[in-house]
Swiss-Prot record:
GO biological-process terms attached to the record: leucyl-tRNA aminoacylation
InterPro entries in the record: aa-tRNA-synth_I_CS, aa-tRNA-synth_Ia, Leu-tRNA-ligase, Leu_tRNA-synth_edit, M/V/L/I-tRNA-synth_anticd-bd, Methionyl/Leucyl_tRNA_Synth, Rossmann-like_a/b/a_fold, tRNAsynth_Ia_anticodon-bd
Single GO MF annotation: aminoacyl-tRNA deacylase activity
Gene behind this protein: leuS
'HIGH' region, short sequence motif: residues: 53-63
Keyword annotations from UniProtKB, A to Z: Aminoacyl-tRNA synthetase, ATP-binding, Cytoplasm, Ligase, Nucleotide-binding, Protein biosynthesis
Subcellular localization(s) per the UniProt record: Cytoplasm
Amino-acid positions noted as binding ATP in the UniProt annotation, renumbered to this chain: K625
Name listed for the protein in its UniProt record: Leucine--tRNA ligase
SUPFAM superfamilies per record: Anticodon-binding domain of a subclass of class I aminoacyl-tRNA synthetases, Nucleotidylyl transferase, ValRS/IleRS/LeuRS editing domain
UniProt motif ('KMSKS' region) ranges: 622-626
GO CC terms: cytosol
EC number in record: 6.1.1.4
Amino acid sequence: MISPDKRYEADTNLYNPSEIEKKWQSIWTENNLYKTDELTENSDKFYALSMFPYPSGNLHMGHVRNYVITDLIARFQRFKGKSVLHPMGWDAFGLPAENAAIERGISPSVWTKKNISHMKSQLKLLGLSVDWDREFATCDENYYIWTQYLFLELYKSGLVYQKESEVNWDPIDNTVLANEQVDSEGKSWRSGAVVEKKLLKQWFLRITNYADELLKDLEKLDNWPERVKIMQDNWIGKSIGANINFNINTNPEKNITVFTTRPDTLFGVTYLAISVNHSLIKKITDQETIQDIENLKQYLKDNKNNELEKIGIKTSLIAINPVNSEPIPIWVASYVLDEYGTGAVMGVPAHDLRDFEFAKKNNIDIKQVIVKDKSEQSNELDNAYVENGYLINSNHYNGLANTIAKLKIAEEGVNNGWAENKIQYRLRDWLISRQRYWGCPIPIVNCKKCGAVPLNQSDLPVSLPKDIEISANKINALGNNNDWINTTCPKCGIGARKETDTMDTFMCSSWYFLRYPSSKCSTKPFEKNEINKWLPVDQYVGGVEHAILHLLYARFFTKALRDNELFDIDEPFKKLLTQGMVQSAAYKNNKTGKYVSPSDITDLSNPTDPIDNSKLEVLFEKMSKSKYNGIDPESVIKKYGADTARMFILFKAPPEKDLEWGDTDVEGQFRFLSRIWKLYINCAKNINSKSNSHPDKEKSLIKSMNIAIKEISNDILNNQFNTAISELMKFYNSLSNSINDINNNLKIDALKTFCILLAPFAPHIAEEIWHLIGFKKSVHLEHWPSFNAEALKEDSYELVIQVNGKVRDKVNINNDMSEDQIKELTLKRPNILKWTQDKEIRKIIIVKGKIMNIVV
């Protein structure tokens, strides 16, 4: 890299980040400093990736934290001699862009590209070491052609299918949502609307085919946060049990199947509960019961976001328990879900808390079949007994441990035809159909003769129409665009219609990390050999909110495409860091529930509402417009510089914890960089002048420098960036205190080392001060320093002296003392003579550097 023609020469010693940062960003771009090196057989690779952003139009502090963390890691690995791939792109399709475009009466394409341009310029202000040559947006036709290509690959392998299904319908965004996109309150993750149910013909991916592998391979992900793995484990929701068939007494040929993980409790079943939509409902003829069920359906619809009462409706239907032939009443219950298991569950009130509550409320028998101790008998229970124990009231299984009985009873059922061993998953197939314009078109043609026909890969891409109508509240759906929709069937050649649904945006983000290693490839989504070289991603950084959606889908895609022999990797992300939120002070009036802008508050140290003079509560919450607590990164960079923003973000809190914004802390980092600047300015003026050499100060500085190298290296590897900066500050203090009392060679070595250690954190000032002290090539092309273990050794150590195993004294010993010298020194000490005088010393054991034991 070429040094700038004219070095920045300040008239004063003041640190001027805006000029420094602008200059070096330009030079780095001109010199392609961060272009990815080609991988060779002898080079080590490191793939550093942030979850790519949705181009909303403006960078926020959450973005800054994400990308600065990844950039630090990428820079460090580059210093360590790795070939680093650190790309950036845009997750550009989706409802927010479409809705924003509708509001403004412009095309989503125009809106999105404008936002990308603005956000890219903001990102560049941070001085990221990104290889921008590999940039793409998922809405680019030369990207989504390959999303369509991969859809067809999955179709060929039987992982894509279409069916009519009751789906989650967002009435605000007018589109279907996957189960994962509906929150625990039954609301859309995007719009916040209460989700409705609707019957539509939809496209699905068979993610359930990979449920077991997705679950088992979580064990391979040693460098993922435990909470993310637990969230995926729970979402996949594997249950090992059995399907039990209960005959219906009025029709022995008809049975009801119930999934259970507790066959050991079958003798305690006192009722069966079915959902309001179970097929057996049709067998009910009593009009009053039918009306009660309809009322319950309405209640469930009206209260789907609230905690439900345990409502039960007893039917005239009776099931027969296969283990003892006892009749069991069938109830319709509010708590039984259609979508889990078979839509029917067995009620064991004595050994299930929910069933116990339901039975008590509806006067249903409670039969205890498990006790804690073999000697116990059944008693009236105050609550359900849910622990392990021994069977009672269970015929020939009495006395067996329930864990063994569980297997034995299931085995009996399998042998006699009334049970089937079953593994059940909570995970459901991935619904990918969306009824909106701004998404990747599905490469399917609907033919009256042939049905749904996949396009040939040579017919791709299916492009979005550009001549779209935008009204006050919607973009004209693809199905209403006759010029676009009409086509011919690729199978029979007659007139047909294109599929009018677009894909869920998670389809685009489930494989984007595979595109970067060969982003310019024009004949396929990616080069197999490049994927096998660069993948998995060595460090992935993003929010924990993507634990179930994006991260699970990306793992599924990777495994499915591997099985199509497109590459050889099993998991996409080797190491995952989920950064915490960036929070800022918000001022809330608890009387009105409204937030007040800090600009409207006269005294922030004692905030009151300017309208009613109420005292305001100060809360640190996630930055948002509605709470008036957003901090504009661009204004911070303009005032303090990107390096200060980076240092604050990295220093304020551990990366996985939430970070509270504080102007005082930002100013503290600016002052630290200013002190560094002043030190190097002064050193640059007399870099070659001789200093008075003080051996003690030199030795101390060498030790401080090597401690810094060791600790900062370990801290970065362990994602402890805040403590790394603390070590950097300690090294700076040692350097500044001794700079005039050390020999010139050590001075240059220490200044050089400090500069390299600073560079991943604050790359602009590090580059500038590097050149100020006379170096020509970029500091970012240097090698990371190695620490000298010898320099960390102490001159002396504390020796613990024992007599017959009891501590009697402690003494400082020089490292170079021999064992004889240690004995001579210690045996004369009064505290030792007190215990050894006039006694025979039988043995002396010395563990050098630690302990000495005298046996008398």
